[in-house]
From Swiss-Prot:
Membrane topology value: Lipid-anchor
Keyword Signal set for record: yes
Alphabetic keyword roster: Cell membrane, Lipoprotein, Membrane, Palmitate, Signal
Organism lineage: Bacteria, Bacillati, Bacillota, Bacilli, Bacillales
Subcellular localization, as worded in the UniProt entry: Cell membrane
Lipid attachment, kind S-diacylglycerol cysteine: 23
A GO cellular component entry from the record: plasma membrane
Protein name as it appears in the record: Uncharacterized lipoprotein SAB0392
Lipidation (N-palmitoyl cysteine): 23
Keyword Lipoprotein among record annotations: yes
C-alpha cells in the first residue's frame, strides 16, 4: 500500500513539473529550435531577394492578418540607406523609401539626404532633406524639378538592396547570436560576415566603403514570430560602430495595410 502511495505521489509530482515547465518558459519556442524558427521567419521575406523588377511586387502577396480591411490588396514598403561617419567628421546618410500600393498599382516615396552634426557645446543638429519620387516601369523618377544635377542622377540610378541582395544561403549561416522576447515581441539574429560574402561584395560595389573591416549582419524584427502586419523587419550591415566613427547600411521590405501610407 505504501509503495502504491509513493508511486502516486511521484506521478503527481511529475505532472506538476511538466505543467510548470510548459507554462513558465516565456521565451521558449516549442517545435523547431529557436534558431531554426527565427531563420524561417526572416526567410519568408529574404527568399524574395533579389527582386530585379520592383513592378513584380504589385502581383506579390504578403502576410495578411486582421489588420487588413476587406478588399485591401496591401502596400509594399521598401527602403535602403547608407550611413557614414568618418572619424572626426559629421554623420551623413543617403537613402530611399518607396511605397508600392497594390490597389492602385502606383509607387511613390522619397529620396533622403541627412546630415547629423554633434557639437559638444551645442545640441545635436539634424538637417534632413527629402526629394519626392515615383516609380514608373521599374524606373525611379523625381517628382518636380531638382536643381542639383548630382542628386537628380543619384535618384535616377538608385538601386534598392532588395534588387541585388541574395539570401538564398541564409539557412547555412553559422555561429549566429539569436534573441527572442515573446513579451515585446521582438526577435533577432546576428552573424559575423566575411568580406568574401556575396552581399558584402555587392555593397562594396555600390558604395564607397573605405574600411576593410568585415561587417556584422543583424536581422531584427518587431512583431510576433508567427507573423504580423504590425511589426517590421530590418536588415543592418555594420562595418564600424563606435563613438568616433560609424559605417553601416540598412534595408527593409515589409507588407502592410494600405491605409498606413
Amino acid at each position: 500500500m505504501g509503495y502504491l502511495k509513493k508511486v502516486g505521489m511521484c506521478i503527481s509530482l511529475l505532472i506538476v513539473i511538466i505543467f510548470v515547465t510548459s507554462c513558465g518558459g516565456g521565451n521558449k519556442i516549442t517545435g523547431d529550435s529557436k534558431e531554426t524558427q527565427i531563420k524561417k521567419s526572416f526567410a519568408k521575406t529574404l527568399d524574395m531577394y533579389p527582386i530585379k523588377n520592383l513592378d513584380d511586387l504589385y502581383d506579390k502577396e504578403g502576410y495578411r492578418d486582421g489588420e487588413f480591411k476587406k478588399g485591401d490588396k496591401g502596400t509594399w514598403g521598401i527602403s535602403s540607406a547608407m550611413v557614414k561617419q568618418p572619424k572626426g567628421k559629421i554623420m551623413r546618410s543617403r537613402g530611399m523609401y518607396l511605397f508600392l500600393n497594390r490597389n492602385t498599382r502606383t509607387a511613390k516615396g522619397y529620396f533622403i539626404v541627412d546630415v547629423t552634426s554633434n557639437d559638444t557645446l551645442k545640441k545635436t543638429e539634424d538637417k534632413e532633406k527629402r526629394y519626392p519620387v515615383k516609380m514608373v516601369n521599374n524606373k525611379i523618377i523625381p517628382i518636380g524639378p531638382i536643381n542639383d544635377e548630382g542628386i537628380k542622377k543619384e535618384i535616377e540610378n538608385f538601386k534598392f538592396f532588395s534588387q541585388y541582395g541574395d539570401f538564398k544561403g541564409l539557412k547555412n549561416y553559422q555561429n549566429g547570436d539569436y534573441s527572442y522576447n515573446s513579451e515585446a515581441p521582438t526577435y533577432s539574429a546576428k552573424f559575423q560576415l566575411s568580406n568574401d560574402d556575396y552581399n558584402v561584395k555587392q555593397l562594396r560595389k555600390m558604395y564607397d566603403i573605405q574600411t576593410k573591416k568585415a561587417p556584422k549582419l543583424l536581422l531584427k524584427c518587431t512583431g510576433d514570430l508567427k507573423g504580423s502586419s504590425i511589426g517590421h523587419k530590418d536588415i543592418e550591415f555594420t562595418f564600424v560602430e563606435n563613438q568616433e566613427e560609424n559605417v553601416f547600411f540598412t534595408d527593409s521590405l515589409e507588407f502592410t495595410p494600405s491605409e498606413d501610407y
